[in-house]
Each structure stands twice: as structure tokens, then as C-alpha cells.
A protein has these predicted regions:
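Anion-binding (especially nucleotide phosphate/pyrophosphate-binding) glycine-rich loop
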Residues: 2-133
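Hydrophobic alpha-helical segments and helix pairs
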Residues: 116-118, 122-162
Length: 169
């Protein structure tokens, strides 16, 4: 169970309507399974992610970060902790010359579509993958002979210590 003080602290970082208590995870997974998370928080930007991670580490509250919830199995007992959702508010896709930049919450299918619309190749394999680009990068998602490691050149990472760094695979 998450204390009222922790919930109030979260509401100081994100709008109160973005903090949901006892939220059924089946509403947030593509398999439509999973019991309630003690708390689920919709993130709107990288700054909120950093602040919340730092705070939760300080108060020693367990948390996990998800995107679209694709291929995610959650117990019927739910999740004892806080689920941070990197979703549609963190889904910007931008094309620059021959490069495409996408935030973690962008759907892989939308990133593949943007690439196609701008004459960029290499992401065709991602068109049918239901996950987010963030999750795809973490697990090296792939299909039909293509995978993320073949197309990713740079990744900006917010690690568990809330340190932002850029890495090149």
C-alpha cells in the first residue's frame, strides 16, 4: 500500500488527475490481464520521470516504467508499487534530414509510418509491432528479419538514478 504522503508528493509533480489509485493493469496491457497497481502515474515529460524516480528511490517505494503495455504480463494480484506510464504525452516524432527522432512513448507503428512518409527506410519491420519505441529499444524488438539494433544510432536514457545520458549502440 502506498502512503498518503507519497501520493500527495506525486500530485505535486504531475497533475492530480494523472495519479490513479488501485488502477486495474488489465486496462493498460495488450493482453488485457492484470490486477490493480497500488498507483499508476501518467507521465507527461522527461522532467517528471526524473523527479518521480528520484523521489521514489529516496522514500524506497518500488516502481516500474511501462509504455503501451504490449507483451506485458501482470499478475492477477496486481503490482505492489507504482507504475509509471510513458505514453502518448511523450510520443513526439520528428524527422530531420535522413534521421528520425522519437520519444519513448511513440508507437513503433507510428514511427514506421513517419519514416515511410519521409522516404526513410529500415523501419518497415516495425509497422506491425504494437509496442512503443522506448520498449522496442530496450528489448531490441524486431520482426521479418529487421530489429531495432539495425536502425538505432543514438539513445537518450533516463536511468534509475535519474541521470540522463546519451549512448550510441
Amino acid at each position: 500500500m502506498i502512503s498518503a504522503a507519497v501520493i500527495e508528493a506525486l500530485k505535486e509533480i504531475v497533475p492530480a488527475d494523472k495519479v490513479l489509485l488501485q488502477e486495474p493493469m488489465k486496462l493498460h496491457t495488450t493482453f488485457r490481464i492484470g490486477g490493480p497497481a497500488d498507483c499508476l502515474v501518467y507521465l507527461e515529460n522527461e522532467e517528471q520521470l526524473c523527479k518521480i524516480q528520484k523521489y521514489l528511490r529516496l522514500v524506497d517505494v518500488p516502481y516500474t516504467v511501462i509504455g503501451n503495455g504490449s507483451n506485458l504480463l501482470v499478475s492477477d494480484q496486481g503490482y505492489a508499487g507504482i507504475v509509471l506510464v510513458v505514453g502518448k504525452h511523450m510520443s513526439r516524432i520528428e524527422v530531420r534530414d535522413c534521421y528520425l527522432e522519437a520519444e519513448a512513448g511513440a508507437l513503433m507503428s507510428q514511427v514506421a509510418k513517419a519514416a515511410k512518409e519521409h522516404g526513410l527506410t529500415g523501419l518497415e519491420f516495425a509497422a506491425g509491432i504494437p509496442g512503443t519505441i522506448g520498449g522496442g529499444a530496450v528489448m531490441n524488438a524486431g520482426a521479418y528479419g529487421g530489429e531495432m539494433s539495425q536502425v538505432v544510432t543514438t539513445v537518450t536514457v533516463v536511468n534509475r538514478l535519474s541521470l540522463i545520458h546519451i549512448s550510441e549502440p
